[in-house]
C-alpha cells in the first residue's frame, strides 16, 4: 500500500478542523480514498493524532447517501434498468449492498455478470488500458447484452476506466440520485 504523500498532512491540518474536532462526519466521495483513509491513516499517525483520528466519523458517500440523504429526498418514479459496478474498495468497506440499494431507489439495479475489480487502480487505466480490458472482459460482454439505461459505480477512477474501455457512460450513484430527486416538471 502506498497512500498519498500528503495524507498525513491533510489529516493533521484539515480533517480535524473541517469536522469541528470530530463533531461533524467526514464524507468521502470515492470508495478507494475512503478505504485508504480508514485503513492506512492510523498507522501513519503518532499516538495523540491516532486518538484524535479515532474520534472522527469517516463515512463513504454510499453509506451516507443511503442512511442520511435518501430518506429526505423526493425520489421520482423509477428511471429504468441500472448497471451497477461495485468497486473492489467499496467491497472492502462493506458498501456493496448499500450501493445496490441506492441504485434500486432509482430504478431496477443489476450487477452485470462478471463484475469484479475493474483493474483501473487509480491512474493505471491511462497508462495500461490493457489491464482494464483484461479485467473487465466478461463484464463488458454482459454490459453489451444488458440493455441498460444507466451505468453507476462509487469511485471516479472505476467510472472513467469502464467508460473508456466499455464505451458506456458510467457515473457516480450520487449523480443518478440527484437527477432522480429533481422535482417533476409539470407540462405547460
Report the location of each language-model feature.
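Positively charged, low-complexity/disordered segments
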Residues: 1-9
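Iron-sulfur cluster-binding electron-transfer modules in prokaryotic oxidoreductases
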Residues: 8-188
Amino acid at each position: 500500500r502506498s497512500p498519498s504523500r500528503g495524507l498525513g498532512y491533510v489529516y493533521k491540518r484539515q480533517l480535524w478542523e473541517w469536522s469541528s474536532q470530530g463533531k461533524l462526519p467526514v464524507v468521502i466521495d470515492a470508495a478507494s480514498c475512503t478505504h485508504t483513509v480508514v485503513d492506512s491513516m492510523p498507522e501513519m499517525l503518532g499516538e495523540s493524532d491516532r486518538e484524535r483520528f479515532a474520534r472522527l466519523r469517516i463515512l463513504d458517500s454510499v453509506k451516507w447517501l443511503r442512511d442520511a440523504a435518501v430518506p429526505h429526498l423526493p425520489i421520482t418514479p423509477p428511471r429504468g434498468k441500472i448497471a451497477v459496478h461495485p468497486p473492489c474498495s467499496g467491497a472492502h468497506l462493506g458498501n456493496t449492498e448499500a450501493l445496490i440499494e441506492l441504485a434500486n431507489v432509482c430504478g431496477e439495479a443489476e450487477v452485470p455478470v462478471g463484475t469484479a475489480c475493474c483493474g483501473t487502480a487509480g491512474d493505471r487505466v491511462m497508462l495500461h488500458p490493457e489491464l482494464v480490458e483484461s479485467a473487465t472482459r466478461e463484464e463488458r460482454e454482459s454490459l453489451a447484452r444488458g440493455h441498460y439505461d444507466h451505468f453507476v459505480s462509487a469511485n471516479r477512477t472505476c467510472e472513467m476506466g469502464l467508460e473508456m474501455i466499455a464505451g458506456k457512460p458510467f457515473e457516480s450513484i450520487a449523480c443518478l440520485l440527484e437527477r432522480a430527486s429533481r422535482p417533476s416538471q409539470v407540462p405547460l
